[in-house]
């Protein structure tokens, strides 16, 4: 088997483009949701980068960022599912590069408890990206011949669930909200809902083509992504409250010491 499935991918794209949709809006409305999602997620990434520079910490877990940027490279430039999607993926990739830079700048502060990681973070990121790129290319070459364009959904949405739960774990393990913000969450959450609406629309109006997104696995990915975003908000409130209590305690002790 070849490591690339370019011919099979081209055939899958032709099949999608040449298959008449049951309703005129089945392709255009989801494209609108995709564009909205792309803009919101880009804003979220930009806010993450700004917060990383400001707080000298970061919100996006490293393994998620490595998975994200390499996925965007694979489906933005190797297996493109259409111009609009490719533009969105390329846009995310550019912002991810800025986010990587912000993370590297914050490394001495974010990883001060582990100088070894701080000193070698650039190398860790490079190795992580190489492994993730290999993973995405291997998955594409293996599954495109059998499921075609479905591979985009089947690989993108698990990463969304992973990002949410990893961000929750990050908040709890750090015990603070440095690098995180409500603006990051709102734009990310609304972007995820817009992307989910894209598939809800397709599932309802074109189940013959997009029914795979409402299989038990598809339901887990779509509902799990939205649900875990809600859990993140609750955890953020909890950690923020603890932060305020600790700050208040420190201030009280400082006043007594005077």
UniProtKB/Swiss-Prot annotation:
Coiled coil: none annotated. The chain crosses the membrane at residues 29-49, 58-78, 83-103, 124-144, 151-171, 181-201, 220-240. It is an enzyme of class 4 (lyase). Its main location: membrane. InterPro entries: PaxB-like. One of its GO terms (molecular function) is lyase activity. Keywords: Lyase, Membrane, Transmembrane, Transmembrane helix. It is found in: Membrane. Disruption phenotype: Abolishes completely the production of macrophorin A, 4'-oxomacrophorin A, 4'-oxomacrophorin D and 4'-oxomacrophorin E; and leads to the accumulation of yanuthone E, 7-deacetoxyyanuthone A, and 22-deacetylyanuthone A. Changing residue 96 to A: Completely abolishes cyclase activity. Terpene cyclase; part of the gene cluster that mediates the biosynthesis of macrophorins, isoprenoid epoxycyclohexenones containing cyclized drimane moieties. The first step of the pathway is the synthesis of 6-methylsalicylic acid (6-MSA) by the polyketide synthase macA. 6-MSA is then converted to m-cresol by the decarboxylase macB. The cytochrome P450 monooxygenase macC then catalyzes the oxidation of m-cresol to toluquinol. This is Terpene cyclase macJ. It comes from Penicillium terrestre. The lineage of its organism: Eukaryota, Fungi, Dikarya, Ascomycota, Pezizomycotina.
